[in-house]
Amino acid sequence: MIDFFDLDYDSLSQKRSAELFSLRKKTFKDRLNWRVSCEQNMEFDVYDNKNTTYIFGVYEGSIICSLRFIETRFPNMIIDTFKPYFTQLHLPEGNHIEASRLFIDKERIRALHLQQHPISLLLFLSMINYARSLGYEGIYAIVSHPMLIIFQRSGWQVSIVEKGLSEKHQNIYLIHMPVDEHNQHLLIKHINKKSPLLNNTLNAWPLSFCVRENRSDQFQLDPKPYGMFGIGNT
């Protein structure tokens, strides 16, 4: 089983936090060469704090994917970090969350023989399921153009709120990710098409997914240097 669950910052064990921040350093600094802060072979920043919740995808005790959620009423990267890259950048009032630091560790995926499973679709679904479980109205994130295409190909009906230009003069986007039942069903249908097993509780949170062989993930995140949920820290 691949298990998806959430932990808040204060609930992270020392072992789990070291594993998470080490994987983030490998992804965002070593692989993508983002302008991020690293110490002791780990990547973390001021947004890793008591207001933060992490989504984990875990298989056989190892983290294979993760992302970070912060309620938009608290300081977040959209307003504090990325505002200079947009002519206008405003988040609507309401019960929303910001997503950042999303990654899928492809080395672990290969080592655990999971590359034939729709990991990225499951991670996207876990975002919806988590948000729905707590009554959030939607998710916002800053993404690159290639990442926007990945979301669109997944079937998730994300929308562009604002368009900006990064410090590398590349297009970046503030997007809204709906968490309604319709979009949840779209992703579940897509997952079932690729892995037609008896996964009857895909709308649940926490989320567990029964794995099998000979299924491909066409929407696996490709670790090219274009960034995922952002372009880097200032």
PLM region spans:
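A short helix-loop-beta-strand connector motif used in the catalytic cores of GNAT acetyltransferases and
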Residues: 46-55, 74
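Short connector loops at helix/strand junctions that flank enzyme active sites
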Residues: 50-52, 64, 92-97
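Short, His- and charge-rich active-site/binding loops that engage polyanionic ligands
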Residues: 58-90
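Acyl-donor binding region in acyl/amide transferases
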Residues: 82-172, 176-177, 181
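Residues in well-ordered beta-strands of folded domains
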Residues: 3-5, 56, 70, 100, ...
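Short, solvent-exposed loop/turn elements at beta->coil junctions and helix N-caps
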Residues: 39-46, 162-165
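Charge-rich, low-complexity intrinsically disordered segments
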Residues: 101, 169-234
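Short amphipathic alpha-helix that is part of the acyltransferase structural core
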Residues: 1-43, 54-56, 63
